[in-house]
Amino acid sequence: MNKRELYDSFEELEKQTKFTLSQIERIKAEMGKVIEKNAELEIENQHLREHLHEIEQKQKGNKEGTELSKSRKNLEKLYEEGFHVCNVDNMYGSRRVNDEPCVFCQDVIYGDRH
């Protein structure tokens, strides 16, 4: 190999090395963006999990508070069998016409429970 060929080979190697270095820098920049996005998503995911946990706890608390008492369950059963359980116009115990819903009965069963 003469000096000219050696010099040309060295220049070609230098070009390839510069190209490889530019690729490495580009990949490094992309990798930095991916790592940053991943960190953001992990934080967001953690916040969403905490929010979901709070919602589940509230729903669990609401379900415990919405359980009907034994007497209201009995009224609900009578209502489902087609009888009034409200005392509007002395209708308690009378048959509901065509089993139509009665908001007064529903209020007695499911209404405010303080």
Swiss-Prot record:
The gene is yabA. Homotetramer. Interacts with both DnaA and DnaN, acting as a bridge between these two proteins. The lineage of its organism: Bacteria, Bacillati, Bacillota, Bacilli, Lactobacillales. It is found in: Cytoplasm, Nucleoid. Binds 1 zinc ion per subunit. Keywords: Cytoplasm, DNA replication, DNA replication inhibitor, Metal-binding, Zinc. GO terms for biological process: DNA replication. Its cofactor is Zn(2+). Belongs to the YabA family. Zn(2+) binds at residues 84, 86, 102, 105. This is Replication initiation control protein YabA. GO terms for cellular component: nucleoid. It comes from Ligilactobacillus salivarius (strain UCC118) (Lactobacillus salivarius). Pfam families: YabA. Involved in control of chromosome replication initiation. Inhibits the cooperative binding of DnaA to the oriC region, thus negatively regulating initiation of chromosome replication. Inhibits the ability of DnaA-ATP to form a helix on DNA; does not disassemble preformed DnaA-DNA helices. Decreases the residence time of DnaA on the chromosome at its binding sites (oriC, replication forks and promoter-binding sites). Tethers DnaA to the replication machinery via the DNA polymerase beta sliding clamp subunit (dnaN). Signal peptide: none annotated. Coiled coil: none annotated.
